[in-house]
Amino acid sequence: MAQQVNEWLIALAVAFIRPLSLSLLLPLLKSGSLGAALLRNGVLMSLTFPILPIIYQQKIMMHIGKDYSWLGLVTGEVIIGFSIGFCAAVPFWAVDMAGFLLDTLRGATMGTIFNSTIEAETSLFGLLFSQFLCVIFFISGGMEFILNILYESYQYLPPGRTLLFDQQFLKYIQAEWRTLYQLCISFSLPAIICMVLADLALGLLNRSAQQLNVFFFSMPLKSILVLLTLLISFPYALHHYLVESDKFYIYLKDWFPSV
């Protein structure tokens, strides 16, 4: 009886590694978003229950403690969890970058606040975009999609196997980073153009009426223009990411056969 309990505990520990690694990068599963680390650990523990019998049947615990092979097992699980979390966190990082860029252009970078979603200092628009994306993520079934990827990863990459750092892996990471910056620019570009035009108009106004302090109402004017532009462009804001996400499958198909 004691041996079976130990085997189940070892299987639970192995099953817990991959979701824990995923939560370290995915903003929605961080302790700041869920309220406390204890609550986050409870959520992650519940995510491991569906795959716990599968890991127990693989008898991985027979190899634990006999040599140092468990180090490779833990490293492989961490790499897989980080890879899934990195892909899922790209949109959240991109909208936070877009918000910080817009606040920099409108001169409101001193109003930074703590964003519990990404657990870092962010701007006002960055927090707004992050909360908006969280709502869209849950409404559109993004969390279900992430869980499907997590559980299907155990079918293609069971514990003991890991991803290879080959040329296809580098191409995939390069595509992810390129999409991160493209999504940031495409998300904030309409508002950037409006603010540049507003700065040009205020500059011409200052040349014609030098007694008028245009900097006094430049920030409120640009803030209103940014909000109006974003309200108009929100339906098309994440379209670029949906288009680019189809290209990810091409890199995944080239990468996974080498595993």
From Swiss-Prot:
One of its GO terms (biological process) is protein targeting. The chain crosses the membrane at residues 9-29, 35-55, 78-98, 127-147, 185-205, 214-234. It is found in: Cell membrane. GO terms for cellular component: plasma membrane. The keyword Membrane applies. Belongs to the FliR/MopE/SpaR family. This is Secretion system apparatus protein SsaT. It comes from Salmonella typhimurium (strain LT2 / SGSC1412 / ATCC 700720).
